[in-house]
Amino acid sequence: LNNEQLDYSSAAAVEVHDRGLALFRGKAGCISCHGETALGDGNVSNYDKWTEQLVDAKGRTEEDRLEPYRTSFQKYGALLPRPIRPRNLRQGVYRGGRRPIDLYHRISQGINGTPMPNQEQTLTAEEIWSLVFYVRSLPFEHASRPAGVRNLDRERPN
């Protein structure tokens, strides 16, 4: 399966899209960072891999973990570490390019130094292409409320 050879209006495209959605929410584990609706609102407390090793391993509060930076590095002008925000996939802007092959490489190889894992050992090539197809469809879909989420919007009085 090559994403560029697929007729987007065909029944096969619907099947590939649905397979990609199932992988996104399941086996690939994308929702843990990118969120249920791929808005980048999943886990937002990850740091880059280098900082994560320095500040995250001992179960301390974030305030405690950042104390060494405040007391030693900051006086020399170093900035405090900041969490890496997962990409909002609905915007259609991706690190490393938006061509199908670019997304395939991002998913299969991951992004070095970030929490974005490689999926090469987890997913087959066909599964990665299904995921690419699904991710490329996201900017054109309405971001809907995930199933099971309560509607907390209140009606306004007239």
Q: Model regions: which residues?
A:
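Conserved beta-strand positions that form and line the central face of beta-propeller blades
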Residues: V16-R19, N88, P115-N118
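Electrostatic cytochrome c docking/interface patches
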Residues: L1-G26, L39, R145-N151
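C-terminal capping alpha-helices of c-type cytochrome domains
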Residues: L1-N2, P100-N158
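Gly/Gly-Pro-rich "capping" loops immediately C-terminal to redox-active cysteine motifs
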Residues: T37-P100
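Short glycine/proline-rich turn/loop motifs
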Residues: L1-V14, P83-G92, G110-N112
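Short, solvent-exposed loop/helix junctions and linker helices
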Residues: S10, V14, K27, G97, ...
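Short, solvent-exposed loop/turn and secondary-structure capping segments
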Residues: G35-T37, D41-D48, P117-Q119, A143-G148
